[in-house]
Amino acid sequence: MAGRYAPSPSGDLHFGNLRTALLAWLFARSEGKKFLMRVEDIDEQRSSKESAESQLADLSALGLDWDGDVLYQSTRYDAYRAALEKLDTYECYCSRRDIQEASRAPHVAPGVYPGTCRGLKEEERVEKRATLAAQNRHPAIRLRAQVTSFDFHDRLRGPQTGPVDDFILLRGGQEPGWAYNLAVVVDDAYQGVDQVVRGDDLLDSAARQAYLGSLLGTPAPEYIHVPLVLNAHGQRLAKRDGAVTLKEMLIDAPLHTIFSRLASSLGYEGVNSAPQLLEIFDPTTLSREPFIY
């Protein structure tokens, strides 16, 4: 049994990222689970080794420890390919503009792929494949879903039902890449992760991931989607809000003060270290409301 934190190494972690990481660590450690670290670096254009090292150093500085070696998704491509071959899939030749225009149809739910390429005849596929090849582009690979919704359980929100469409498993374009939904399901199963603590901006992904896990024969983990940190304007905190990364905050405050701010955002005052917070952490008292930075 294990929890995990899985950042994408595209820059320094900000206060909201650090808070979610702390919560993932607290939930796992307080329940006697292993805590694993995974670097989600499948977006090779945005990811960097330097960002990964910086993120891991920040988490360690805050007192978060993990079990075993860090797993890098960039080493797992063979596993994703093996999983893909087990699934019912089809090629998608749509551009982003194609999907946006098709999604404006009144019968299509926002954010749901309308299935444009699902029923194409083979001769149509050959033609569209050739058109993309002439542009040095590859088709995407989509799951041929057999349901339009799927049930899952969230520890903070109870029973949930979310939309499922023919979502992308392998991104197309000039540089194809593995999609988040496939990679995260395969890696959670591989690592034995049975508890996923993450921001509630990813709640909409849970139904797709739980459904995909069912197709691959892996049980869904316990989902715990925690409230985000928002800025003063009620928008999700971002690095552009200024002085929100650990390095920036350390300019004006010592590390124990920054940790105290993180603990305070969870409702614990006067706590200056991860071990101290772990001793008193009570998941039942976690606020369901976002924290305003």
Swiss-Prot record:
SUPFAM superfamilies: Nucleotidylyl transferase
Key word Metal-binding present: yes
Protein residues bound to Zn(2+): 92, 94, 113, 117
One example of a Gene Ontology biological process annotation: glutamyl-tRNA aminoacylation
Residue ranges of the motif 'HIGH' region: 7-17
Full protein name: Glutamyl-Q tRNA(Asp) synthetase
Required cofactor names: Zn(2+)
